[in-house]
Amino acid sequence: EFMEYKHGYGPEMITGLAKIDGLLVGVVANYQGMLMNYPEYKMATYGQAMGVGGKLYRQGLIKMNEFVTLCARDRIPMLWVQDTTGIDVGNDAERAELLGLGQSLIYSIQSSKLPMMEITLRRGTAAAHYVLGGPQGNDNNAFSLGTAATEINVMNGKTAANAMYTGRLAKD
């Protein structure tokens, strides 16, 4: 059984209550695929937008924060399932205050004192890995699981190479 919380809001995230072997659990998972006319803060600026599943945006961070708070209120343990490439970046993302929303979510997770479990299916990248129940940002995490294909990193290789060598390549 699964009862979704705020369907349609923050469509990159699926949140809801599930019964697993008779035990009620809060489930948070990210959606893979294209998200038409989303995120809303890019729609307001450009009149069109296309979000990418696996990336976190404003509404999804707000939705997760509210859901963690509700689970904490009712002492419902949580299961996090992630396959993420990170939190949206750029000027629009900064104006949408994504960093602050991520910090608020980590605070909610830490103060909830709920038992949690996290599963990384393919990728757990950067701050998105932490806010999706990753053990680095979660003292309540009982354990984390991965698959043979799981990659967890602070920054993907291409981004790291660009950050390290862009200035040097421009000089040469």
Mark where each language-model region is:
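Ligand-binding clefts of soluble mixed alpha/beta catalytic domains
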Residues: 1-172
